[in-house]
């Protein structure tokens, strides 16, 4: 049962109640979003052109995304799978996210899109310490940033 004020607003199973956007509507959340997939409330994303490009994944970036948002720094994230644990926070907080469909390999088009966004940023922050075989294009992005002489920060929480 979901109560708003003194009235029952909605009732049913969690799957019926917690649909995309329902919690935002129920509690009139306007300066952020409730992420149904993660159960987290995220603040409003920073607007503007991304200043920082973040290479993250597997839970390495969510804390950094929130820190950048709190500091008012617009950022982009790539390349993430839509099933990555970092994806809901990236989607909520980043100005731009370059993402592949869940359970699909990253493709050259993802790399090219991410490279274009990354090269327009002033800085790259890499949260990854290991690049596996399914993450080879993110390793190439990191190498591209190094080769171009971009400012790079290695970040771990």
Identify the meaning behind each predicted range.
Residues 110-120:
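Short, well-structured alpha-helical segments in soluble
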Residues 26-109, 126-128, 132-139, 148-157:
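ABC ATPase nucleotide-binding domains
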Residues 118, 144-146:
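Short, conserved loop/helix-junction motifs that constitute active-site signature segments
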Residues 1-16:
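Conserved switch/coupling elements of ABC/ABC-like ATPase nucleotide-binding domains
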